Amino acid sequence: MLALVGLSAMAQENDTVSMQVNDSTALVEQSASVKKNVRVLSVNAEVRDHLTHDIIKGLKGVKLNAADSTFVDSIYGGYYDENGYKSSYISCAVLKPGKYLIKVEAEGYQTVYVPLDIKKLYKRETYRSLKPIYLKRMPKRNEIELDEVVVKATKLKFYMNGDTLVYNADAFNLAEGSMLNELVKKLPGVTMEKGGVINVNGKPIDTMLLNGKDFFNSDRELLLENMPAYMVKHVTSYERVPDNVKGKPEEKSAKKQLVMDVRLKKEYARGWIANAEGGGGLTFHRNEQGKHDGKFLGRLFGMRFDDHSRLVLFANANNLNDYRTPGEKGEWTPLQQSEGLRTTYKLGGNYMKEREERYHYQGSMETTYSETEDRQNSNSATFLEGGDTYGRSFNTRKSYGWDINTRHYLNLQHDEPIGDFIKGLYVYVQPSVNYRKWNHLGDNASTTLSEDVASQLGKAWMDSIMAPDAGGLLRKYAINRTRSSSKNQGHSTNTYFDSDLNFRPAHNDYIRFSLNLSHNYSDYLSKDYDHYLLDYPSSTTMPADFRNRYTPVKNREQTLNVSPGVTFSLGKKRQFDLIVSYNFNYNDQKSNNPLYLLNKLEGWDKADSHALGTLPSVDEMLSTLDADNSSNDKTTRTSHEPSIALTKTFWGHVKDKDGKEIEDESWYAYLNARFRMPCAHERMDYQRGTQVDTLMTRNTALFRMDVTGYYSLFKRGRSVNFNYSLESSAPMMTNLLNIRDDSNPLYVTLGNPHMKNTHRHSFYGQYSDKFGKTMFNANANVNIVQNAEAMGYIYNKETGVRTVTPDNVDGNWNMNAGSGIDFPLTKNDKWRVKENANYSYNHSVDLNGTNETLVATRSVVRTHNVTEDLSLTWRPTDKMEFGAGGKLTYQHSTSDREYFTNIDAFTFQYGVTGQIDLPWNMQVGTDLTMYSRRGYSEASMNTNELVWNARISKRLPKQNLTILFDGFDLLGNLSNVRRYVNAQGRTEAFYNVIPSYGLLHVIYRFNKEPKKK
């Protein structure tokens, strides 16, 4: 009797192998169906290489009677290598108790005999795992090496392997010295945005892995910027269950993660690699001081690794504050420019070790020091009933920050039974610590104007606003003027501990228990110093208001979370899962926020009387407490959240026209519904001067639910998923207090004891498919908010004061629909087209008014956005690649509000890119793009900017060196001005950044492979 049960033990542990398992289990049932009510126990074991612990293909074996070694049954051997999981295993069916011998063999390995003692078959036990089996290789024989046969073929860029999308890294042209981020940007159906945000077929990835293992806790920017592209063999993408819910009751109800897994070439799977890069350059144009700003880049990256361990050390230093590379399609518009000068120094390390498929531990430590200098000058207009107001502001800020992060985790797994009590034991422990220290210095000068006269003084505006005596324009048009100097310094510490435990009874596979325990503690301390002067140049009756403010802030918070749960597998094939869980959460917060007005002291009422950061004696300082703007509170929150969920799983094979199943084409689907009811008791002890001294309690019972559906046709790369969720939340307790905060004289906030709960409905649907070499995706979502929290305000046109009150409004909703397609124009894939289209609508409801209306009224703004992005790539040879493309964005905003000016604005770009490999190991890459804006009523916002970037490189193979020169914005047309328009107003901001510069840098590569035996 042939019994194929492949990995049935993993069927309930890992959704990614459920198709193979369920099919194999079905065969076991068929083979045993000749007898009714026959109990079948599936016995399986992992099989690995004795030294490397790699998977072994071609496993086979038999089950023998231990007493006389007679043949009993065949054994199924298989392997699995998808979705980041590798497994080679043997599996057999046991129909009656007894002692057996399992004979395991594979080509090139010594045969192994494993004893198997089954004392009893239990009614509700369907599988049992054995300890991992390790095979030793046979001694090597003398072999004759044959000459290599070279076959040239068109390189396939991507294909489907089951439900995994696989990209072939060697099929893409890349510039010399390219890191992983340059490769990812070229993958069909993939887009990458600033900050390492990556979308695959329209869906954002949640986690990035290296060879199936987490890398720096998914710090994808570190991996993207430091892993050389030449080391990569494949980039794969697939969905998987998040690590933090594996084994828990919510495993099947949890939203799956979209993963991008970077697979290295075989020659880089073991050994040492090191990369060093250094460079320097200058801006092409002079700064405000008449000098060229210097640019520098330094990078060190070293990694020792094999299939089961990894050690990484890295160091980075640069002042580029940029992430783009010349010669590629990029976003070089002013909106994508950096906002200041930033210098960063980073040092860190990472380690990983796993062994015997039983434990895995990993950790990392990283420290960063940064210096930032920002200077911003801005013009703005605020749209108001009865007439707009206008503003000019000048801000400078210097920041120094240092932080250190360390995080470690340990996984322990024991699949086989432990005595007669439990099996499938999984333990997870993760501690982490973060410490941050900072120091900020800033100066600000601003004015609010009743008329748009910003252009009349030009650069002299700053001197005019800063001058003690207001000039003629300010005396005529300025509603108010502020000048301030500030200093903020502090530090924070955050510790986090998370642990999981889950297991099954030793002889019952229809139930699983889990327990999660976590604790978080944070401590925050900051000191704010501020010299603030407010005056009213156009008024002869309103006095100036100078404040010397000191605010020491202390916040401490800790959270304890305990969550037990149980999963019941129902049905003969366990296709139903009933998940019952309970979550207990305890949160304790303490906050102390005093405000001291040092200007109340004699001799402290002028900005130049005492240096910023100077404090009087303790007794003097206590006498200046602004009690009504100081608060002290302690809040405790205890929450009990029962949860119930039901999951139905479906699977099968695709059928042909005749109704016959196609063996290698399978499908998988599930439907899940989950319901939660968090019930919380909150207690807040709050004091605020003469306004409030109260002990406030609140009991809330909320309802939350979500329904998720998923369907996947593995081999064809087709998937459909949808989700509906309802989230309810209660307003912050401090917003319910009847208090007034006027610590900022131009921004006064009030409380509202009549706030209601907010309810958010979200609908999401997504479809993706692959037709040959064509990739297509479409998605849509709708979000509806009931009783949305709005910070309604009344604006006083005479003083410029905003009085803000939280309130609930109905009518807020938005929708978004998009699609993307990536396809070849020719069979040889030399011409390729990529297109993305998107439409969004936002129905925004807010509350605002003026001192003329006295009340805040509903303000509804309707905004439509349409985006079309089209690009064409031509790759005539492996040494050349050219591209052309364009992007159009249209914004249309309307409102029934009086004095509202409709917005009909266009932003569009078009350009070309090219990359050519030259003789003498040289390469040139360049891009030329025109960025334009049209449709703005303000003429200065309708702009054209032609941007040209280029890179030239020279490779020195013998020295393992690459020399590169990058030229950014060679024409000097890219502005350091950002312009924004929305329903609330428009802003034009100037930043202290010169985006036009050149950089010469050198890259050194080192790679050491292990000696071949």
Predicted regions and their residues:
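Short amphipathic beta-strand segments in non-cytosolic proteins
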Residues: 60-84, 149-156
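Short acidic/polar hinge/loop motifs at secondary-structure boundaries
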Residues: 214-242
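Short, acidic, small-residue-rich periplasmic hinge/interaction motif at the N-terminus
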Residues: 17-35, 64, 105-107, 127-170, ...
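A short, solvent-exposed loop/turn motif at the edges and junctions
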Residues: 70, 88-89, 95, 99-118
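Short, polar/charged loop or turn motifs at beta-strand boundaries
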Residues: 164-187, 195, 200, 210-215, ...
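Primarily recognizes Gram-negative and organellar outer-membrane beta-barrels
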Residues: 218-221, 243-294, 308-1013
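Short, surface-exposed beta-strand/beta-hairpin micro-motifs centered on an aromatic residue
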Residues: 78-95, 197, 223
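Structural motif
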Residues: 33-35, 44-57, 69, 155
